[in-house]
């Protein structure tokens, strides 16, 4: 069964079938329903690599989200949905575990779904060094800088994680705290965590304090993981008076552990 066979049985053109399979809105409900009934009946899966199929780019924008507990990413997705509402574009949101390789997933999604562009919400910059040349659509990386990678199809939007972390820890020092714990991500998996930890260290040094590795608790960017990390820190009997958490959800988890 090919897309041509689907078109013949449905009584519509190949281009109409293609628009339905790509999630386009410019198709009547009658045509969409008939075509999808046939697709489901034959359990048809488009073969995007077959030479006889026309290679098309869908009108979908792919968002690859690292982790499922980031409140900031949820807000960003809502704004994007509001922005494209009523346009010819559709949004495909795909969640990944924070340990996953988002670039490998982007390569797979490009091959199977042919999005017109990709937005990476979170990521490990190391993965972009390795396989990003296989991604051939415009992309934007959020939360890390891509300007030094040298890819013409990759732009980025990010904050200065190091400066922001330094300011946050400065605030704690300015309010009299000296025994400060830090809860953040795994350095090997999270590029922003590296910069935020460096910013925290810079603040410690500026205020004449040594940053001890025992002050840093590694956690996933989730409520439960931060909760457990804070409990481990409390169980260590350290005289902690303040905590710098590297994300909102981590802060909530740490607060819950303290209150418990």
Language model segments and positions:
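Hydrophobic alpha-helical
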Residues: 118, 123-130, 194-260
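Residue-level recognition of beta-strand->loop/alpha-helix junctions
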Residues: 95-97, 184, 215-218
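Short, surface-exposed alpha-helical segments at coil->helix boundaries
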Residues: 32, 74-78, 166, 193-201
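Alpha-helical recognition/docking segments in bacterial nutrient-uptake
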Residues: 56-170, 174, 235, 239
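Hydrophobic alpha-helical segments within soluble ligand-binding/sensing domains
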Residues: 155-182, 198-202, 223-233, 251
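N-terminal helix-turn-helix DNA-binding module of bacterial transcription factors
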Residues: 1-57
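Short beta-strand segments enriched in small/hydrophobic residues
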Residues: 16-19, 53-69, 171, 179-187
